[in-house]
Curated annotation (Swiss-Prot):
GO terms for biological process: regulation of DNA-templated transcription. Residues 152-217, 399-434, 731-763 are annotated as: Disordered. A zinc finger (C2H2-type) spans 53-76, 322-344, 350-372, 445-467, 473-497, 503-525, 540-564, 566-588, 594-616, 622-644, 650-677, 683-705. This is Zinc finger protein 341. Belongs to the krueppel C2H2-type zinc-finger protein family. Residues 177-210 have a biased composition (Pro residues). GO terms for molecular function: DNA binding; DNA-binding transcription activator activity; DNA-binding transcription factor activity, RNA polymerase II-specific; RNA polymerase II cis-regulatory region sequence-specific DNA binding; zinc ion binding. Binds DNA and to the STAT3 promoter. It comes from Homo sapiens (Human). The keyword DNA repair does not apply.
Length: 854
């Protein structure tokens, strides 16, 4: 196969001959009709800037093929230190051709121009791969000679050639005007019949670089020498003649053997071993080694990574790495470096003209300008539907449905209807209602710029991004409320207010009269950014609607645009913000879609219905970890846990005015207590003239009229409206209390002191035995007054009158009222009576029945 090359160039040494023979036999790049070969897919690789021809002995590399062949003729020295390269430029492309000969010659261009060589610095390509992407030097030499011998051959006209799998360095060239063609060479013998050609090769080129003319690169092929055609080749600047055969000493220098394949890394100027040898050589059926090549995608990625690391070979200066003086980061552009340095210094050279806020990047100023845009004044209202409350008539008799629809009662209410609109239709006409009215609540969110409606606020907020162009720039001056749709007119208007404007630092809050003074001040925060004042998390609240804002400017804009007037369309209530109105609207509706099957209540969400179901089941899954209380709802447990806190956070706000020192653990208790200071008692009892400030207190009072108490004493059957009152109740009639009374009796009888005569001598007279339980009941029963006609008799005593007998002159009676820990009207405690009394004393419990006067 290589005989044609050996006959054309007889001056090659044995090393070159062995390399060429092993290449042609092993890689199977050229079809051999006499031997078996393995067809490897053509490797597509990006092209470097120039072709490189490497000498096998002295390792010199050349960019020009004639200069390389001249070097081979002059018997190069292996120890030459200098490496010279010559550049080869082309101005056309190779036409495709193919032939089934032993050696396939590369197609030649119609016109070729070779420039003079230049000297470049030594290239890192002094070593080549054994089985990698870059071939050994002798392989490059073989391909170069094959291309050189094909320069004098005519241009064929035939099918596309088979691209050699040899990975040669090619140079892209731009098409220029071709010179006039030279005279045709002598005819050559015709080639043998061609074989079916494989698919044509794809265009080669570096990633991202266009190839003019489709294939404007110098490509080296192994093609047949004798080809028919009329193409001519003209070589300028170098007169090239056939070289005579050279005698080379029969010495073969074995190339170095690498244990593992190496990959050339252009960026690091060196070689590095591969990993687990991904490109291991394959063994053919004949026992030869077939070189394997990386996939085109792998080659393209590798070339792209190392394209910037070949400054010597490409002839371009290497980009200088700009290193940050504060850290170890490097940048290729000065612009990126300067922006990075600002992160260390805190410098912010770009200021907003409207508010003076400084930024490190100009793009951030443009983003910040969007914060000065507001919605137009006419579209800053609420998102509540105008017909949020509607009344729909539902017919109980389907035959009368058409008549009810004709009345128009199902239409939305035009104004603010009265609460009477909820009354069932047909009740006034007869006892049986034939239709009923259902109040429907529209809780959707309405867009102010289009008729779209959304079920949640987040959907509306996402939709409003489509109307961003509706926003306008508003003047920052308080007295000027002008708006501008364009930024240019807004900035021109701001300049007219420069004498009136004051600028506030967003870091420390200081005000400055001019934009320049603010900019100078902001550099003080940039000197030591790590010690700059921390941005306070101050929250600015609106006193009317309790909305929170992060800046005073935002709060001021809210006060200027918000109406704080949101009336309910169904009643006369007015709310300061929209969310309060939305929370109030469901109170007019049917309650929701989810109905409880036990109590027939409606709920807006299924989750609320599930929580409500615990009330009917009696299940209390939420238990207190401190006490034994259990609750059927989690919020009730959370509210209950407040009573276990050691400090009461909610204090009466009128303590400085009225001296009220009451404190509470729960906010709802404080709210109820505040109403007691107003003096307004709107809840009146229908059975008596009492009135209460809370509805719950009225309900407790009404149980006293009906006798339906929640809590009753087991001993005396007295009823209480609260558990606290039952706990404080001192029952004298219960069996346990009677046992305690018997155990506390004195062991001996004592006589009551009695003064006799004027001497004041005390005489002890025996007291009767303490009244037993049955006697006390009989005594109490005898004191029950007669029932007044027309009024129910008293069922139980309202109080117990404790009478202290003997011992103390100043002792008075004590009236014990249920619910009060201390007695009423007693100026001495029982312990003081027992300690200060000279004689014995006894306590008599007398039931007292109190009847209110007419």
């Amino acid at each position: 196969m290589a005989q044609a090359i050996f006959e054309a160039l007889e001056g090659m040494d044995n090393q070159t001959v062995l390399a060429v023979q092993s290449l042609l036999d092993g890689q199977g790049a050229v079809p051999d009709p006499t031997g078996q070969s393995v067809n490897a897919p053509p490797a597509i690789q990006p092209l470097d800037d120039e072709d490189v021809f490497l000498c096998g002995k002295c390792k010199k590399q050349f960019n020009s093929l004639p200069a390389f062949m001249t070097h081979k003729r002059e018997q190069c020295q292996g120890n030459a230190p200098a490496l010279a390269t010559v550049s080869l430029a082309t101005n056309s492309i190779y036409p495709p051709s193919a032939a089934p000969t032993a050696v396939q010659q590369a197609p030649t261009p119609a016109n070729r121009q070779i420039s003079t060589y230049i000297t470049v610095p030594p290239s890192p390509l002094i070593q080549t791969l054994v089985q990698g992407n870059i071939l050994v030097s002798d392989d490059v030499l073989m391909s170069a000679m094959s291309a050189f011998t094909s320069l004098d051959q005519p241009m064929p006209q035939g099918p596309p050639p088979v691209q050699s799998s040899l990975n040669m360095h090619s140079v892209p060239s731009y098409l220029t005007q071709p010179p006039p063609p030279p005279p045709p060479p002598p005819p050559l013998p015709p080639p043998p019949p061609p074989q079916p050609p494989p698919p044509p090769p794809q265009s080669l080129g570096p990633p991202g670089r266009p190839n003019p003319g489709g294939n404007g690169v110098v490509e080296v092929y192994s093609a047949a020498a004798p080809l028919a055609g009329s193409g001519t080749v003209e070589i300028q600047a170098l007169g090239m003649q056939p070289y005579p055969p050279l005698e080379v000493p029969n010495q073969c220098v074995e190339p170095p053997v690498y244990p593992t394949p190496t990959v050339y890394s252009p960026g690091k100027q060196g070689f590095k071993p591969k990993g687990p040898n991904p490109a291991a050589p394959m063994t053919s059926a004949t026992g030869g080694t077939v070189a394997t090549f990386d996939s085109p995608a792998t080659l393209k990625t590798r070339r792209a990574k190392g394209a910037r690391g070949l400054p010597e070979a490409a002839g371009k200066p290497k980009a200088q790495k700009l290193k940050c003086s504060y850290c170890d980061k490097s940048f290729t552009k000065n612009f990126d470096l300067q922006q990075h340095i600002r992160s260390h210094t805190g410098e912010k050279p770009f200021q907003c003209i409207a508010c003076g806020r400084a930024f490190a990047q100009k793009s951030n100023v443009k983003k910040h300008m969007q914060t000065h845009k507001v919605w137009p004044p006419g579209h800053s209202g609420g998102t509540v539907s105008r017909n949020s409350v509607t009344v729909q008539v539902m017919a109980l008799n389907p035959s009368r449905q058409e008549d009810e629809e004709s009345t128009g009662l199902g239409q939305p209410l035009p104004g603010a209807p009265q609460p009477q609109a909820l009354s069932t239709a047909g009740e006034e006409e007869g006892d049986k209602p034939e239709s009923k009215q259902v109040v429907l609540i529209d809780s959707s969110y309405l867009c102010q710029f289009c008729p779209s409606k959304f079920s949640t606020y987040f959907q509306l907020k996402s939709h409003m991004t489509q109307h961003k162009n509706e926003q306008v720039y508003k003047c920052v001056v308080k007295s000027c409320a002008q708006t501008f749709p364009k930024l240019d007119t807004f900035l021109e208007h701001i300049k007219s207010h420069q004498e009136e404007l004051s600028y506030r630092c967003h870091l420390c809050g200081k005000d400055f009269p001019s934009l320049y003074d603010l900019g100078v001040h902001q550099y003080s925060h940039s000197l030591l950014p790590q010690h700059s004042p921390k941005k306070d998390n101050a929250v600015y609240k609106c006193v009317k609607c309790v909305n929170k804002y992060s800046t005073p400017e935002a709060l001021e804009h809210h006060l200027q645009t918000a109406t704080h007037n949101f009336p309910c369309p169904h009643c006369q209530k007015v709310f300061p913000c929209e969310r309060y109105l939305r929370r109030h609207l469901p109170t007019h509706g049917s309650g929701g879609r989810f109905k409880c099957q036990v109590c027939k209540k409606f709920f807006r969400r299924e989750h609320y219905l599930k929580l409500h179901a615990h009330i009917h089941s009696g299940e209390k899954p939420y238990k207190c970890s401190v006490c034994e209380s259990a609750f059927n709802r989690k919020d009730k447990l959370k509210r209950h846990m407040l009573i276990h806190e050691p400090f009461k956070k909610y204090k009466c706000p009128f303590s400085t005015h009225t001296g009220c020192s009451k404190e509470f653990n729960r906010p709802d208790k404080l709210k109820a207590h505040i109403l007691s200071h107003s003096g307004m008692k709107l809840h009146k009892c229908a059975l008596c003239s009492k009135s209460f400030s809370r509805r719950a207190h009225l309900a407790e009072h009404q149980r006293a009229h009906t006798g339906n108490y929640k809590f009753r004493c087991a001993g005396c059957a007295k009823g209480f409206s609260r558990h606290k009152y039952l706990k404080d109740h001192r029952c004298r009639l219960g069996p346990q209390k009677d046992k305690d009374l018997q155990t506390r009796r004195p062991p001996q009888r004592r006589a009551a002191p009695r003064s006799c005569g004027s001497g004041g001598r005390k005489v002890l007279t025996p007291l009767p035995d303490p009244l037993g339980l049955e006697e006390l009941k009989d005594t109490g029963a005898g004191l029950v007054p007669e029932a007044v006609p027309g009024k129910p008799p008293f069922a139980e005593p309202d109080a117990v009158l404790s009478i202290v007998v003997g011992g103390a002159v100043g002792a008075e009676t004590e009236l014990v009222v249920p619910g009060h820990a201390e007695g009423l009207g007693s100026n001495l405690a029982l312990a003081e009576l027992q300690a200060g009394a000279e004689g014995p004393c006894a306590m008599l419990a007398v039931p007292v029945y109190i009847q209110a006067s007419e």
